A protein has these predicted regions:
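Residues lining hydrophobic/aromatic ligand-binding pockets adjacent to catalytic sites
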Residues: 2-140
Length: 140
């Protein structure tokens, strides 16, 4: 087992002395309400709406890329209903086809170091950041 993976498994965070090596290690997702960490690297908010009750200081974001978030119509239709997840993934992926420059920029940032896609949804398995990460990793 590589040192980075071992350090991550032991504490949930990579050790400070390790640098992310593979693409999956370089691109993370994290709720905006979770405590920011140095190991997050560049923190990019990928929601269209600003998270409720979150100050800019507390969020500690590098950037807010609302243009890469699902459209208002798609977000409302989905309503974070897990039964709509497969169709949401398909529709959001189709929307992202018009954002090649933004996706390329995120890939470039991930090549330079850790990139954390930050989102506000309560459901950690069914949200736009999950889809976006899969696309950036070339899995969709």
């Amino acid at each position: 087992m590589r040192a980075t993976k071992a350090a991550t498994m032991a504490s949930g965070e990579p050790s400070k002395s390790t640098r992310p090596s593979g693409p999956a290690e370089r691109i993370r997702i994290k709720r905006v309400y979770a405590t920011p960490a140095k190991s997050d690297g560049r923190r990019i908010l990928v929601d269209r709406l600003w998270p409720r009750g979150m100050s800019k200081e507390r969020a500690r974001l590098s950037e807010w890329m609302k243009e890469i978030a699902p459209s208002a119509e798609l977000r409302k239709w989905f309503g974070h209903d897990p039964a709509r997840w497969p169709e949401f993934q398909r529709r959001f992926t189709a929307e992202l086809e018009g954002h090649a420059d933004d996706l390329g920029r995120l890939r470039d940032l991930a090549q330079k170091g850790r990139l954390t896609l930050v989102y506000a949804a309560r459901d950690e398995a069914h949200n736009n950041a999950v889809v976006l990460r899969e696309i950036l990793l070339g899995r969709k």
